[in-house]
Amino acid sequence: MMILTIVVLLAANILATPILPSSPNATIVGGVKAQAGDCPYQISLQSSSHFCGGSILDEYWILTAAHCVNGQSAKKLSIRYNTLKHASGGEKIQVAEIYQHENYDSMTIDNDVALIKLKTPMTLDQTNAKPVPLPAQGSDVKVGDKIRVSGWGYLQEGSYSLPSELQRVDIDVVSREQCDQLYSKAGADVSENMICGGDVANGGVDSCQGDSGGPVVDVATKQIVGIVSWGYGCARKGYPGVYTRVGNFVDWIESKRSQ
């Protein structure tokens, strides 16, 4: 998954994420190719090419990570949607405005949430283009819940090529307390604005560079509960992926969408 070195973004228009010993924008490690309709809310955020993921909230609004848009100019960005491929198919739409959370901290990667408003509306209710529902404000995941992470990130740590087709993986939620204890050894903090997921004992399943900003969806409720944010390496044993806790930002999201 992404790696937070407590430094910040690395090559914003290549992969954009926070880093530790690797880099933040993750892709899916240990997953499978997504099939039509598996993740219809997934979009590719692009400059000259794919660099982050995002999630469809409605015809105009995309949810992504703050670190993905940090320092970015809206006029240079577009999204591709309604396709399983980040480089072809579907439709591209230009970005009109970027709303980065006011309290985003690029050192701790806290409040890692942003909204993107599009210039023209998407055509939704297609097999690969549907909005994802938000959870209730203040809601949280439970240990052991199954969550689905998707994206076009690297398939393994140290890889430098993105898969052409969308990947997905279902993982288990890890307790915030355990996650914080594990990351404290690397000098990082897991806040109440974050959730964690993966296989702590064995590793092998995670997001990786290129997945940043993408959706983390509760398999049971189909609601978006997380945003791919950061991590230590990709799918490393003892280091679960860390995701923005969407439940803590629903009021913020709705306030921006109503402006």
UniProtKB/Swiss-Prot annotation:
Active site: H67, D112, S212
One Pfam family of this chain: Trypsin
One GO cellular component term: extracellular region
Residues in Peptidase S1 domain copies: 28-258
Signal peptide, first to last residue: 1-16
UniProt-listed GO biological process terms: proteolysis
Cystine residue pairs: C52-C68, C179-C196, C208-C234
Protein EC: 3.4.21.-
Site (Required for specificity) location in chain: D206
Annotated GO MF terms: serine-type endopeptidase activity
Cell location: Secreted
Keyword Protease annotated: yes
Propeptide: 17-27
Alphabetically ordered keywords of this record: Allergen, Disulfide bond, Hydrolase, Protease, Secreted, Serine protease, Signal, Zymogen
Database matches in InterPro entries: Peptidase_S1, Peptidase_S1_PA, Peptidase_S1_PA_chymotrypsin, Peptidase_S1A, Trypsin_dom, TRYPSIN_HIS, TRYPSIN_SER
SMART domains for this protein: Tryp_SPc (SM00020)
UniProt xrefs under CDD domains: Tryp_SPc
Entry-linked Gene3D superfamilies: Trypsin-like serine proteases
Keyword RNA-binding: no
Family: Belongs to the peptidase S1 family.
Protein name (database record): Mite allergen Der f 3
Origin species: Dermatophagoides farinae
Phylogenetic placement of the source organism: Eukaryota, Metazoa, Ecdysozoa, Arthropoda, Chelicerata
